[in-house]
From Swiss-Prot:
Catalyzed reactions: L-glutamate + NAD(+) + H2O = 2-oxoglutarate + NH4(+) + NADH + H(+); L-glutamate + NADP(+) + H2O = 2-oxoglutarate + NH4(+) + NADPH + H(+)
Gene that encodes it: gdhA
Protein family: Belongs to the Glu/Leu/Phe/Val dehydrogenases family.
Broad class of enzyme this protein falls into: oxidoreductase
GO biological process: glutamate catabolic process
PANTHER family: GLUTAMATE DEHYDROGENASE, GLUTAMATE DEHYDROGENASE 1, MITOCHONDRIAL
Positions contributing to NAD(+) binding: 220-226
Source organism (scientific name): Pyrococcus horikoshii
NCBIfam families attached to this UniProt entry: GdhA_Arch
Alphabetical list of PROSITE patterns matching this protein: GLFV_DEHYDROGENASE
Catalytic activity, EC: 1.4.1.3
Record's keyword annotation contains Cytoplasm: yes
The protein, known as: Glutamate dehydrogenase
Quaternary structure and interacting proteins, as annotated: Homohexamer.
Amino acid sequence: MVEQDPFEIAVKQLERAAQHMKISEEALEFLKRPQRIVEVTIPVEMDDGSVKVFTGFRVQYNWARGPTKGGIRWHPEETLSTVKALAAWMTWKTAVMDLPYGGGKGGIIVDPKKLSDREKERLARGYIRAVYDIISPYEDIPAPDVYTNPQIMAWMMDEYETIARRKTPAFGIITGKPLSIGGSLGRNEATARGASYTIREAAKVLGWDGLKGKTIAIQGYGNAGYYLAKIMSEDYGMKVVAVSDSKGGIYNPDGLNADEVLKWKREHGSVKDFPGATNISNEELLELDVDVLAPAAIEEVITKKNADNIKAKIVAEVANGPVTPEADEILFEKGILQIPDFLCNAGGVTVSYFEWVQNITGYYWTLEEVRERLDKKMTKAFYDVYNTAKEKNIHMRDAAYVVAVQRVYQAMLDRGWVKH
């Protein structure tokens, strides 16, 4: 369970990064606040003829480096604080990847499991009508997130085009779309594919002779967890010895087959009881003696309580915020190489950027081209962060913040928004 206010955590992380760089007080004060917060009311006609009123948000955190970019979350416990924090993190994520974007995030307080498809469509279109004036391919570009998907993006794009009375490049108004209407190849696997490149480079800086035969444990078997298991085993020859979902995990020292585990999970609702594997708890998975640990589920799973028991040499944060600030210190002292979340999982937003570029230019790339360009972007970002960490003798998360905040600060200086 998340105990701290998400936006307070985001501000604390920013303040901590500021200690390792030269930044004016006024700029820091500016960066602690979103540039725009919009709250909207969305009336939706339900299938029974009644009207239900929903609350939605869109936060545009900082647009010094370009149009704001970030997903739209549908969650029964959505809060403005969470949306603000995620918009701040998107600002740093796009900056660390050196994408020409700022950071944004959207959310609607709703339990989508209680809505029919027709009700979901009406809610999606209603949200776009409500935020139409503040989004565009050149101002703020939404994408899928928690409980939203390509179908919802398609309805949203269609509504935007209907109001705007124009077609392409309005395609670029939203990313994460179905392939039939301007989506990009490689988007499904993007988060895991990007993470795999950072794990590969982390192994190099640790002096490993490749990843073949090395072991990995993955907490979380959703989209990112499954693709990471598949990519690390099939493309890099790693042994995926453990995976888990919210109900528990499985362990097999000889390795697990990603596709077979996925099939089992779909048929039985969980990876648990997979033939030939031993059931383990999520807590046990985190403390396994493996080469790489990839938390790919929820936030705050490695804390000061269990950080001392982590045995992996590399912790690849595929999830958002899986390691608490106190645990960061412990892992750093233990000499564990951490790949911080907004670097490790930035493959998703990077391929979203590629999708937008393809929409704007009207020229579409092959899967090989998408992967090759993603590899270049992720590898450069990894070394930007790693070299900063080495140079300043700070851990990777602080270094990622320093790289990102410095880039946003420079853009603000160049625009004349703040002074040195």
